[in-house]
Amino acid sequence: MITRKILVLFGLAFLATLGYGIMIPSLSVHAHELGASHSAIGVIISAFAAAQLLTQIPMGRLSDRVGRVYLVVFGFGLMAVAATLYHFATSANEFIVLQALAGVGAGSLWPALMAMITENVAPEERGRLMGAFNTVFFLGVGMGPLIGGLIASNLGRSAVFNAWTLVAILGALVCLFAIKETASDRRASAARARATKAADVQMVNAGFMATFTAALVVRARGGVCSSFNNALLPLYAVAMFEATPAMIGSIMFIHGLGLAFFNIPGGMMTDKVGRRLPILVGSLVATAGVLWYSAAGSYWALFAAVGLAGAGAAFSTPAIAALAADVCDPRRRAEAFGYFLTSFNLGMVLGSLVFGFVSDMVGLSGAVLTWGITSLVLSLFALAIRETLAQPRGMAVAGEARA
């Protein structure tokens, strides 16, 4: 199942999340020192997700037509440009523009990357594959802030932007030279796209639109959590426990670690019992962690709560990704993953904007509690999901035993 090409794709996913994560511990604190309010910081964080949200679906369609590699290289290139220009940003508006530029880069690379990973994989193996992919993805999410916090503490904030630039350039070069996509591959992609358009193929299989929509709502919950953590969690940790940049990076690292290592058991469970149950259980566990944020009486209690939130979210993510592949026509799979990714980014946009304003009105502690309640509401959409794995492996084994 894990081929050389998939290992390279996993490496590209790691580099994409590592580079952006390196910058995250410094961004909101730096913007706050330049005079940005909590709501302005929310806008800065949301600009990345908003740009990604607006570009992922058209870039997914473009990837189905012209091939995958060019879009991934282009995305890494835009991230490198944005990271370099951060050295010259001195106001909130300039941060917003650069976040948007980096978001366009992310919107270009992720649909193509995920489509390449899921191509030619049997449905009963998708959960484990996505679990392994998400483990690598979230290792980058966790290690980026940890490394970025250490860089900022020892070398200054400007050094984190240099590090992000180098990582993005490395990603572009690895994709360009390690992934082989021939002209005939691109012509075949274009031919499939033309045939799909001519046949007017539906993206979501008949009877599964409500299931697909409910899964996207739960996925959006993860986006809200990420934006909340990126925008307000560093400020909350500083206000409550006088956290240093290294301490903030450690909190984000444990969230990423939980996201990384609970994807594999989540993926295995997804292939064994189906998609619906892991989505529901994982999102509720994540909600328990978020509610614990507001009750944390010490830095280490907050550290544990953030880790629990990450673990729960990770357990549900492979099931949502596998469900998206299950219910969508293979000829429009990159577009489908565009919607999958867009739901996450919609959550990021709304989360950072809404909770930035909530924090200005009721304070950071009030915003934390409000987010916990919102997380519970979004998690309950999992109850509307219809099982998509035709015969979960555990049920199949039980049936064979009875026979």
How does the language model describe each region?
Residues 31-32, 62-63, 150-155, 237-238, ...:
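Interfacial helix-cap and linker-helix signal at transmembrane-aqueous boundaries
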Residues 98-137, 322-323:
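Cytoplasmic helix-loop-helix junction between adjacent transmembrane helices
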Residues 82, 93-101, 289, 300-308:
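Paired small-residue
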Residues 67, 88-93, 242, 274, ...:
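Helix-breaking motifs and short loop linkers at transmembrane-helix boundaries and internal kinks
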